[in-house]
Amino acid sequence: MPELPEVETVRRELEKRIVGQKIVSIEATYPRMVLTGFEQLKKELTGKTIHGISRRGKYLIFEIGEKDRLISHLRMEGKYRLASLNVPMEKHDHLALKFTDEQLIYADVRKFGTWELISTDQVLPYFLKKNIGPEPTYETFDEQIFREKLQKSTKKIKPFLLEQTLVAGLGNIYVDEVLWLAKIHPEKVANQLTESSIHLLHDSIIEILQKAIKLGGSSIRTYSALGSTGKMQDELRVYGKTGEKCVRCGNEIQKIKVAGRGTHFCPFCQQK
C-alpha cells in the first residue's frame, strides 16, 4: 500500500511530467471510481489545463483550470503511468486523462482507489471532514498537541497512529519502522507512554517519513511510483524482517497481529 512517501514521490513525478498538459478527453472502463460522477468529471475537465499537483496526507490533488480540484486516493494498489495515445487500456486500467500526445492511466487491481472532483473552496472543508492530522514536519507536527492526544487515549499505539488523526501519512510499513526506532511496543497503550517516549516517537515519525521521501519511498511487492523505483526498502529495519536479527540488539524480529495488521517488532528493544 502506498504511504505518504510513495504518494509524495508520485506527486513529484506527476508535477514534472504532466503540469501544463491540456486534457483533451477522459476515458473510463470503471466509472464508479469517480465518486462525484464520471459524466460530470468529463464535462468539467475536458479542455482544461493541469496547473499543479499537490498532496495532503495520502491524497493527491490535481489542480485543474481556475477552480477545479481532482482528489485522488490510491488506496491499496492504485498506480499511475504515462503511455502514448495508441496504447490500449489493459485489464486493470480503469481511468485515463488523455492529453495531446500521451495519456495518464490509472490502474488499480482491487478497484479501491477513488477520484473526486471538488472546487478550490471545498478543499479545506473536505480535509477537515476527513480529520487528517498534520503533515510530518517539524513546522506542522506540534509535539505538545501530539502529547496531549496520546495522554488522553487508551488505544494501542500502532492502530492509533494508523488512524491518520494524529499525523498524516503513516501506513503499516512506516508505523513498524517508527515504533522500532522509538523503541515502543506496537501494543503499548497510548496514555502509558512516558514524556521521553512521546518525544522520541514524535521525532522518529518525522525522521522516518522524511528519509523515505528523500529515498523515493519503498518499492516492494507490486508497488512502484509512476514506474520509478524507490530505495527506502533497503533501509527498513523491521518490516518484512521476520526471523532476522535486529540490527540494534541482535535478537530475532517477530511478527504478530495488532488490530488485524501484520506487525513486525523486536521483543527485546520494544518491550511492553
Curated annotation (Swiss-Prot):
Entry keyword annotation includes Hydrolase: yes
GO BP of this protein: base-excision repair
Binding sites annotated in the UniProt record for DNA: 92, 110
Zinc finger (FPG-type): 237-271
Cofactor: Zn(2+)
Cofactor note: Binds 1 zinc ion per subunit.
Active site residues per record: 2 (schiff-base intermediate with dna), 3 (proton donor), 58 (proton donor), 261 (proton donor)
Keywords: DNA damage, DNA repair, DNA-binding, Glycosidase, Hydrolase, Lyase, Metal-binding, Multifunctional enzyme, Zinc, Zinc-finger
Catalytic reaction equation(s): Hydrolysis of DNA containing ring-opened 7-methylguanine residues, releasing 2,6-diamino-4-hydroxy-5-(N-methyl)formamidopyrimidine; 2'-deoxyribonucleotide-(2'-deoxyribose 5'-phosphate)-2'-deoxyribonucleotide-DNA = a 3'-end 2'-deoxyribonucleotide-(2,3-dehydro-2,3-deoxyribose 5'-phosphate)-DNA + a 5'-end 5'-phospho-2'-deoxyribonucleoside-DNA + H(+)
UniProt entry tagged with the keyword Lyase: yes
Positions in coiled-coil regions: none
The organism's place on the tree of life at top rank: Bacteria
GO function terms (MF aspect): 8-oxo-7,8-dihydroguanine DNA N-glycosylase activity; class I DNA-(apurinic or apyrimidinic site) endonuclease activity; damaged DNA binding; zinc ion binding
Classification via Pfam families: Fapy_DNA_glyco, H2TH, zf-FPG_IleRS
Family, similarity comment: Belongs to the FPG family.
Subunit structure: Monomer.
UniProt function note: Involved in base excision repair of DNA damaged by oxidation or by mutagenic agents. Acts as a DNA glycosylase that recognizes and removes damaged bases. Has a preference for oxidized purines, such as 7,8-dihydro-8-oxoguanine (8-oxoG). Has AP (apurinic/apyrimidinic) lyase activity and introduces nicks in the DNA strand. Cleaves the DNA backbone by beta-delta elimination to generate a single-strand break at the site of the removed base with both 3'- and 5'-phosphates.
Protein name, UniProt field: Formamidopyrimidine-DNA glycosylase
Annotated source species: Lactococcus lactis subsp. lactis (strain IL1403) (Streptococcus lactis)
